[in-house]
Amino acid sequence: MRYRVTTKFYVWIFHYNVTKGISKRVILLYNLKRGTSSIFRCCLCEKLNFFPVWFLFLFFIASHINILFFFFLDVLWFLWCYLCSGLFLFDVFSHLPGTLCEVQFFRLWIDGLSPIRYFIPQH
């Protein structure tokens, strides 16, 4: 499943098989201007097999209320991903283009863009 944002961000939500045949959900968000060389977010959710849809509503509301509150939710998102995956920096997908690294997710605040504001489903 792929969603296109009317700005310059894309979000992919899919399952990827890693070692021992475990299917983990991977969430990637990267900057289209720089292509796959600048990936902002990647979460491996091992313990939960569903995507927290309620986070989308919180992000949408927060992005229209206060940028600090939106930042706070992004930190919560990061902690949720960390608790689910037990990983902070990882290179599991080193064979894929780009660098999968949670550190770069703060770049969203430099750009001042909401990653989930205008979702358009694509098939």
UniProtKB/Swiss-Prot annotation:
Compartment list: Membrane
Name under which the protein is recorded: Putative uncharacterized protein YNL114C
Note: Partially overlaps RPC19.
Topology of this chain in the membrane: Multi-pass membrane protein
Keywords assigned by UniProt, alphabetized: Membrane, Transmembrane, Transmembrane helix
Gene Ontology terms: cellular component: membrane
Lineage, highest ranks first: Eukaryota, Fungi, Dikarya, Ascomycota, Saccharomycotina
Main location: membrane
Segments traversing the membrane: 53-73, 75-95
Organism: Saccharomyces cerevisiae (strain ATCC 204508 / S288c)
